[in-house]
Swiss-Prot record:
This is Casparian strip membrane protein 2. It is a multi-pass membrane protein. It is found in: Cell membrane. Residues 1-21 are annotated as: Disordered. Pfam families: CASP_dom. NCBIfam families: A_tha_TIGR01569. Keywords: Cell membrane, Cell wall biogenesis/degradation, Membrane, Transmembrane, Transmembrane helix. Belongs to the Casparian strip membrane proteins (CASP) family. Homodimer and heterodimers. Disulfide bonds: none annotated. It comes from Medicago truncatula (Barrel medic). The lineage of its organism: Eukaryota, Viridiplantae, Streptophyta, Embryophyta, Tracheophyta.
């Protein structure tokens, strides 16, 4: 029966196994969260992009209708959510690569950098749209902007719902960035 001893400077193979298992778990969670964020941004873009309503009455020359493309802020919101959804779909490949190969660090650094850029884009689009939705619901009496959600309640319901999905994706991005930072820091030690 042979007894093997570990000399100083050697690392046993069993010591890296828990760390590798934790990194694999983080990578699997990263993959799942990216899928949820992609679905959330896609739902938000579709909900806002199809939001329109026509008033049931019309005058002889004027027909009262509202659509998302009437406001440039909503166009930016749809564009930002679409770009982020496309990025998330493409980043699933890299996220799956991290499940298979847990020791890759450079690709994780690239992913955390791009995640941060997309987080900023998504946050700016969602925040700008939230400001317009607030004015649509409550108006601004000092600027003489009247709320119009009482007349266009279906439209306002859709745009408010699309904000929920977008802000869920913002929270998921915060979690993804933190998890990537943890994964990168664990690989340096």
């Amino acid at each position: 029966m042979k007894v093997s001893t570990i000399e100083s400077g050697e690392i046993s193979k069993g010591a890296s196994s828990p760390r590798k298992g934790m990194k694999r778990g983080l990578s699997i969670m990263d993959f799942i969260l990216r899928i949820f964020a992609a679905m959330s941004t896609l739902g938000s873009a579709l909900s806002m992009g199809t939001a329109k309503q026509t008033m049931p009455f019309a005058t002889r020359f004027v027909r009262f209708k509202v659509s998302f493309h009437d406001l440039p802020t909503f166009l930016f919101f749809v564009t930002a959510n679409s770009i982020v959804c496309g990025y998330l779909a493409l980043s699933l490949v890299l996220s799956f690569f991290h499940i298979v190969r847990t020791i890759s660090v450079k690709s994780r650094i690239l992913l955390v950098f791009l995640d941060t850029v997309m987080f900023g884009l998504l946050t700016s689009g969602a925040s700008a749209a939230a400001a317009i939705v607030y004015v649509a619901h409550y108006g601004n009496p000092s600027a003489n902007w009247f709320p119009f959600c009482q007349q266009y309640n279906s439209f306002c319901g859709r745009i408010s719902g699309s904000l929920v999905g977008s802000f869920i994706a913002v929270v998921i991005f915060m979690i993804l960035i933190l998890m990537s930072g943890i994964s990168i820091s664990k690989s340096k030690h």
